[in-house]
Amino acid sequence: LIKSSFGYWQIYTSDRNLTANKRDYMDICIINTGGTISCIGEPLAPMSAAEFATASQTILNPIVAETFPDTTLFYETALTFPESSTGTLDSTNLQPSDWCLMAQYILDNYATYDGFVILHGTDSMDFTSSALPFLLNVFDAQGFGTAVLSKPVIVTGSQVPMFYKAPTPPSGPKPALTLNFNTDAYQNFCGSVAAARLGIPEVGVYFDSKLYRGDRVLKINASEFRAFDSPNYPALAEYGIEMTQYGDLMLPGPVGADVSLDNATALAAAKTQLTAITAAIDSNPVMQLPAFPAPYSVPNATAVIADLITACAGQGIKGLVLESYGEGNFPSGNPDHPAGDPTATPPIPAGAIYTALEAANTAGTIIVDSTQVIAGTVNNSAYASGAWLPNVGALSASDMTPMASLTKTMILLSAATANGWTADQVKTLIQLNLFGEIMNVSRLDSRTNATLLPGQSIMALDGSAKLINDPSSGPIMTASDGTFLWAPFGSAAAGKPGRLVMQNDGNLVLYNASHTALWATNMGDADGGSSVLMITGSTGATNLTLSVYNYSAKSVSATLYPQS
């Protein structure tokens, strides 16, 4: 959303056209789901959405109108949670079906408003903000959006309630509500409205003057106003005296008007998918399991953690997010031989935890290897204590939070049948960057991470091949055993150093330090062609490919490996 002297313009860019719809006002929907921000009294008790709306219209709206006279706030009260007598819900008690209710309300009212602000409790805010991107968007089996969010959805809450209600005197009129003293609720509310006015086409969390990507946040503090942070991805905007935006960090939104949720067909597709997810989500439970020091016996092949895994699998858990130590290390139950050694004399049994995870994987449970450390990236091959995990089917969460890993896995499983995805396709999607929740491991995207600098690399999701931009020789793709697979000039020896750029015209170009093109696919489109360089498949399955996919035209524009 761009502000000009004429008002607000909502812009959709595609490769072949540009349309603009002039707006001289903004309508923002405030959805109160509950939480501290809308509690009053001693002890704190939730207000109904209607009570909070009345108080906000009286106390907050005049202040907002002074700063944003062209913005109208609408307090919607129709969304209620059936498990609560007040209709609002402490986020401690939210369940996955409640995420679907929020998403359904947004989609049902999408055409009415220019943006949405969700007031939410802080206890599980990072789960909700991680779930909503996967509920509000539709994508194909390759992870490319087919119905994409085009408006802001900002989630916020507070550590201190918004309003104060004095004790009721024995006689006389009841005291009116007032703004609470030293509350972060007021700042977070106003900041969220300001953030929604930016028109960022993604789900965000606004807290303590910063706007974060919703599927990147973690709750880091229970008692201070800086309750949330995004350790693995920078803030999208900061509110000081003025709002400072970091546009290069924001999601680009729909690639064209045809896949925007402003398009009636795309919106209908999103609603259809959400209906299917809502029907299936309770049947696809996913749980988190942290690594912790617990008893195990190598000779007896027993372990407390193994018993927990077996019990959970027996209850129908469809996904298991391991919150491992460090870079993705998880106890196996046999430190020296996680998988055992049946050829030894006497035979060495596999670790009990290894065996339990192997059985869960065989039974169809998706296992994701995350980390309980708040920042950094999973690299389970760095230590022997984590290198065994791929053998039991564990997928790397890379730099995803455990919350994003859980919600993403659960929602993809719930959407699989309706979208016709196989189990292997779901596993691939879990590891792909769909809505900014994870770093791009296997792709260069012209709209988000377009450049491969010297020393940087992308790789196959299973690690069987890597394309590295060698500082001396330029781009070289090799198998994990070092076998040469591809280079722009036919061999590593003929290579030249530079920057490999996936351009937004669909052309993949190698530039030298003087920005002279050394090599190119020469498949560019002058009218634009948002594209991605991607490694798919595996050397082990003999289906490895390196190709340029034009996701504007929905077609492969160049196949670099294998070469015909």
Task: Name each model feature, range by range.
Residues 440-564:
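Beta-rich ligand-binding surfaces for carbohydrates and other polyanions
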Residues 6:
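Beta-rich carbohydrate-recognition modules and glycan-binding surfaces
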Residues 25-440:
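Active-site histidine-anchored catalytic micro-motif
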Residues 21-23, 146, 279, 468, ...:
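Generic structural signal for beta-strand residues in well-ordered domains
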